[in-house]
Amino acid sequence: GSYRDHRRPESVTFVSELISDLSRRDFTMNAIALSADGMLSDPFDGVQAIRERTIRCVGDPMLRFNEDALRMFRALRFSARLGFTIEYETVAAISECAPLAAELAPERVRDELEKILLTTRPETLGVAIKFGLLRRYIPGNGWASPNYADIASMTRKPLTRWVTFSIMLQKYGYIPSAHAFLEELRLDGRTLRCCADAEEMLKCEAPTDKLGWKKLLSRYGVDSVACAVAAYDVINGLNCEKEFKAVLKSGECFSLKHLAVSGDDLLSLGLKGPELGEMLKFLLDYVMEYPDNNKREILLELAKYSEES
C-alpha cells in the first residue's frame, strides 16, 4: 500500500510473491532470502553489495526514503556499524530527502542515533548533521566542527555518550542547550538529570585534589560526575577520568550511604528533625576530609561533643 507521513504504510498488503516482498526492502543487502530447501533468492544483487561493502537502496532511493524517512538514518547506522560505504545515488537521495526526517517521531530518531552513538564510528553523527537530517533538533550551524570520533574512546554507555554528544554540540554552537536537545529527543529522566548536572559542573574547572572530587561526587552522584568528566576530557583533550576513577577505587566515603553512622544512631543522642540532618552533613564533610576517621565510635563521639559545645 501507499505510505502516509513518509513513515507508515496506510494498509498492510499481503505480498504473495517473494520478489515483490524483497523489492520493498530498504537496502539490497537486506533484500536476500533463503528458502527452506536452501535456495538463495537475491534478485537485487545484495550478496555482491555485501562483498563490495556497499549500502545501496533497492530500486529508486528517492522512493524508498519517501516510504519511510527513517531509512536515511538506517543507511548511516549500517555504515557506522559495518564500515560500509553508501553508494552515490543513495547519498544524493539522502541529501534531497533530508527534510522528510523532520516528520519522524522523536523516539524513532533517538533510537537510530543511539545505535550510531554506540558504534566505533560515532563521527557518522556529524554526517547526519551535515546532511540536515537533524535540522528539526539542530537548527543552526556551529562555528567549528566537533571531533565526534573522540566519543569512540569513552565507555560504551548510552548515558555517558548522549550527555557528551549533546554538550559537544552546545560547546561548538550547534544548539543553545544540551539539556533541551536531549529533552526534544525524548531521552529518559536519568539522562536529562545527568546532563543538567554536567552542564553545571562544566562551568567550573575540574577538581585538583581528592577532596574536591569527593565533594563533587557527594553533591551530584557518580553518574553525573562520570558524564561531566567524559565531556570535559573530550572537549579539552585532558584525562581527568584517571583521577576520578582513582577516587572511586579508593573506596573513601563521599555519601551518607557509606558513612559509618546513620540517622538512627544520631537519634539515640537526642537529635531529630533539621538538627539530625545538619549533623549528618557535618559528619560527612568531616569524613571526606579525614577518611581514616570514618568509624562509628569516632563519629558518635564527635557528634556528642559537637552537640554539647
Give the location of each predicted region:
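Catalytic cores of the polymerase beta-like nucleotidyltransferase superfamily
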Residues: G1-S309
